[in-house]
Amino acid sequence: MAKASTSGASRVRKKVKKNVSDGIAHVHASFNNTIITITDRQGNALSWATSGGAGFKGSRKSTPFAAQVAAETAGRVAMEYGIKTLEVRIKGPGPGRESSVRALNALGIKISSIADITPVPHNGCRPPKRRRI
């Protein structure tokens, strides 16, 4: 009877915690959801959170309060990595733009700059039709 070798078994690797003092907060605020990703200067993700992941479903995802809760969640995880200052880059026209920045500031993270990097088309794709209610 063959013996199972224990030396080839999968080992559990210890997660290495990076110590990063400053980073970039990417806020993607669409009309339906808000996604916050906090990265280091090289663009490696440290933490992320969404309004939907924070427990909001349906139309409540697209509220400023849902974006605030998501930003607090992402900010707390990023602070475990030693984040002290953030550069905020906001993309999109959604309602969670301002409240997510305020939530990060309220956590005690210093915000060095806020940049709006919303892509503006040079007359590219046709926009969606206007809503009639």
UniProtKB/Swiss-Prot annotation:
Record's function text: Located on the platform of the 30S subunit, it bridges several disparate RNA helices of the 16S rRNA. Forms part of the Shine-Dalgarno cleft in the 70S ribosome.
A Gene Ontology BP annotation from the UniProt entry: translation
Family indicated by similarity: Belongs to the universal ribosomal protein uS11 family.
Any single Gene Ontology cellular-component annotation: ribonucleoprotein complex
GO molecular function: rRNA binding; structural constituent of ribosome
Organism: Bordetella avium (strain 197N)
Keyword set, alphabetical order: Ribonucleoprotein, Ribosomal protein, RNA-binding, rRNA-binding
Protein name: Small ribosomal subunit protein uS11
Subunit (UniProt): Part of the 30S ribosomal subunit. Interacts with proteins S7 and S18. Binds to IF-3.
InterPro entries attached to this UniProt entry: Ribosomal_uS11, Ribosomal_uS11_bac-type, Ribosomal_uS11_CS, Ribosomal_uS11_sf
Annotated Pfam families: Ribosomal_S11
